[in-house]
Each structure stands twice: as C-alpha cells, then as structure tokens.
C-alpha cells in the first residue's frame, strides 16, 4: 500500500541518487531513450558523472561557442552530415563478433564544470552521438556529457555496455526463469526476482 507508481525516469533518478549517497564508485551512466533526459542529465552533471543517454529523433540540439553552427532535431542534424563525418567502429563484442556500426559525434558546447558544483573544475563537453546501422541505415541518437577531449571511441564503447545488460536479462530468463512468474503481489514478484538474481550472481562467479 505504500508503493506508488513511478515512471522509469523517476526510478532511474532515485537509483542514481542512492548510488551517489552510498558512494558507489562509477564514472559513466548509459541508458536508452525510454529513460528520458532532463532531470537525469542534471542529476549526473551536478555529481560530475559522465553519460551517454539515448534520445528520440525529435530531440533538439544547438551548438554554442563553436566555430560551426548546429541547430535542429537529432534526425535533421544526422541527415545533414557529410559521409566523411561517419566512422565505422565497434561498440563491443556480441555473440556473432564485433558490433559494428557507423558513428558520428558532434561536440556542441564546452562548459565550465564549476557551473554545476563548487568543487568541480575543468571543461566538460555536451555533445550529440549518432549511431547508424550498416545494413539498413537506421539511426539512434544520444546526448553526451564528458570531459573535453573525450574520444568518439570511448563514447561508443560506453554506449555498447548497455548490451551487456540486455544479455544478462536474456540469460536470466532463458537459464534461470526470471520471466517464469505469474504472481500478482509485490512480495511474490520481489521474492522471485531476488532469488533469480542471487542465482544469477552465483553462476556469474562460477563461470
């Protein structure tokens, strides 16, 4: 009765806040577009944490303080890029080898980290990372926040870490029965998931 509905972005913010308050060591956060931006972005910036966060094709981007001007939706900006702006990179290894895509990165604004926390120093960059599927040209978009000079190779590698989470879910479902649960109560669901996660942790150590 004390559990209230919460959106995925608010759940993610609460998770990040708990990690920060208990000094969990981490430098990057990667997420797909379902988690949104805005509050998550500000939470991470104020904690001096880097991020690669998925956004929709309609998300707007604008450059400032740069020698070049960029303004428009993520989709419009990607469509206007010349072919030599793209770089073929692997975001990590999958079951069939390297996950190769074409990538483009635009650093849009350099900001003083001190604007987000009195103890922070240095220049950080807000950017737009774009992933294009080699086979069909389908594109995905990410807003980024990282120290100035961070390479596109680093950003693509961080984005690729999300796949490990998806692989873990698949393993937990196929081998440990994560989705084999039809209880309707919170306690029943929570106990089932907790036991599956314990089993998953044990198998990860054994392997």
What are these model-derived regions, one by one?
Residues 41, 144, 150-159, 173-191:
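Short, solvent-exposed helix-loop connector elements
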Residues 1-53, 57-60, 67, 129:
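Conserved, well-structured functional cores that handle cations and Mg-NTP chemistry
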Residues 160, 164, 173, 177, ...:
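Hydrophobic alpha-helix feature that most strongly marks membrane-spanning transmembrane helices
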Residues 193-206:
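Short, hydrophobic/amphipathic alpha-helical patches that form generic packing surfaces
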Residues 29-35, 51, 142, 163-172, ...:
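Short, conserved catalytic/metal-binding motifs centered on acidic residues
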Residues 1-5, 50-164:
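An anionic, glycine-rich sequence signature occurring as long contiguous blocks
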Residues 6, 188-196:
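Short, conserved micro-motifs enriched in small and acidic residues
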Residues 25, 164-169, 181, 207:
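Intrinsically disordered or highly flexible coil/loop and linker segments, enriched in small
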């Amino acid at each position: 009765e004390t559990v209230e509905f919460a959106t995925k972005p608010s759940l993610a913010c609460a998770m990040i806040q708990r990690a920060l308050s208990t000094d969990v060591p981490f430098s990057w956060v990667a997420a797909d577009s379902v988690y949104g931006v805005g509050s998550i972005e500000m939470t991470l910036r104020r904690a001096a944490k880097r991020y690669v966060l998925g956004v929709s094709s309609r998300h707007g981007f604008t450059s400032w303080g740069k020698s070049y001007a960029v303004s428009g939706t993520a989709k419009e900006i990607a469509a206007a890029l010349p072919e030599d702006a793209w770089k073929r990179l692997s975001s990590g290894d999958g079951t069939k080898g390297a996950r190769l895509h074409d990538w483009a990165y635009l650093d849009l604004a350099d900001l003083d980290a001190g604007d987000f926390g009195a103890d922070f120093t240095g220049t950080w960059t807000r950017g737009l990372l774009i992933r294009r599927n080699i086979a069909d040209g389908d594109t995905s978009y990410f807003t980024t926040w990282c120290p100035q000079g961070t390479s596109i190779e680093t950003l693509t590698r961080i984005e690729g870490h999300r796949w490990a989470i998806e692989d873990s879910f698949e393993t937990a479902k196929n081998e440990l029965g994560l989705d084999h649960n039809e209880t309707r109560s919170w306690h029943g669901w929570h106990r089932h998931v907790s036991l599956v996660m314990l089993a998953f942790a044990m198998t990860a150590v054994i392997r």
